[in-house]
Amino acid sequence: MPSRFSIRDSVPAFSTADCEHALFAAKWPEGFRCPRCGHPHYYEVSSRGRRLFECRSCSHQASLTAGTVLEGSRTPLTKWFQAMFLMQIGISARLLAELIDVTYKTAWLINHKLRHAIGEWDRERPLEGDLQLLGEYYGYEYHRYLGSLIVQQGLKPQPIVVGASLDGAGDIVHLKMKAVDGPEGDDAARRGGAGGEEAAERFVQKHVVGGGADDRAERLERGHRGPTALHIAWREAVRWLAWTFGGIGPKHLQAYLNEYCFRRLLCRNDMLAELIACCGTTKTITYRRLVGSRSGIRPIPWAYRRPARSGRRAG
């Protein structure tokens, strides 16, 4: 990852007017529509320094942030857009707080609200076409020198199904990584597999176009048999989680996996535009909902250990 100094220099100084224009286009891509009556025309008014859009038909006043991920936030739009820009890199809340000059709690909440929007984007885009599935675990230790994933004794890793749509050359077109929760996950841990055929079938049903059809079912492949595109993507995700966050607990693991897949699929320019678009059409999530308990996920420890230095330098 680039240094924080180079990251700071790369963050654009968004203007409030540019942010308002972009959010307006994201919220109403086909032009203004009153959220109450659907009328297409409005008067622009101001109240307590807020820009409002008053419907000419029913006089309902709509704000830019109402009904979006940004609703209820007192953080300036410019800082939100800087956070969206930095989501392209994939940084921690602690570094985000430093870069955009907000508290850690605010940075954490902004990042998770953006991940919430990404989760909705992911949910609306199922896999289709030629599929490949891979059964994996999160909760292994990554050894950067050996380039392998080493199981830790006594851990109960989180089973994961990695799925992708592939093109004719075998390259990933669309990618999903989904945690196997509840009884299926417990059963997978006991049997030493990532959910087996049951997890594969459920993944296909939930995340693949026409998932109920028998001819769409794919056999779940387990293990580290070769450097397939899915293996490489999974190891990149684990490496990013380890180096950036020191590992992620089970409660929010799925949100981080969604973020990784979103970023991997889109180039930087496309990602920022797509993130702004989905933020403008996704309803917000509250801090209480984010930190509340989530049933069906086993608590698992995450172990990450840097290998000891040998003391030798490369020549």
What are the roles of these predicted feature ranges?
Residues 1-315:
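Residue-level recognition of single "structural anchor" positions
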